[in-house]
A protein has these predicted regions:
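Histidine-anchored nucleotide/phosphate-binding helix
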Residues: 4, 8-24
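Active-site-adjacent betaalpha module
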Residues: 4-8, 50, 84-85, 93-94
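Structural motif
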Residues: 5-8, 28, 57-58, 96
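Short, conserved loop/helix-junction motifs that constitute active-site signature segments
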Residues: 17-20, 43-50
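A short beta-strand-loop structural module common to alpha/beta enzyme folds
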Residues: 23-34
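Charged helix-capping and loop-helix junction motifs
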Residues: 38-42
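Conserved phosphate/oxyanion-binding catalytic-loop motifs
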Residues: 54-55, 59-65
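C-terminal structural segments of small proteins and small subunits
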Residues: 66-96
């Protein structure tokens, strides 16, 4: 399953619905939670054990965040990568 998370803060209820093996893309203001020095970094580290996490490059750029500032293990993708993920995942949940 693919989860698209759009806003910050990210509710605990959303995180509880992410199963092992799911893929998660952070978009829009949700990218603000991905900083390696942020308060959310421990939660991200736990998710990364069983899930692949992605962030849209354009959303980082708009907010002045570089890939070097992200929690290790988060993959930066472009719109083509997002399309590939939507095609490869039969079920998609959008959280906004």
């Amino acid at each position: 399953m693919l989860h698209l998370i759009f806003k910050s803060p990210i509710a605990t209820a959303i995180l509880e619905r992410i199963a092992a093996g799911d893929e998660v893309v952070f978009l829009e203001n949700a990218v603000l939670r991905l900083l390696h020095k942020g308060s959310f970094s421990d939660v991200l580290a736990q998710l990364l054990v069983q899930n692949r996490l992605y962030v849209l490059a354009e959303d980082l750029e708009v907010r002045g965040i570089s890939a070097d500032e992200l929690t290790n293990g988060i993959e930066v993708i472009d719109y083509a990568g997002l399309v590939d993920l939507t095609v490869s995942n039969p079920a998609i949940l959008s959280w906004s």
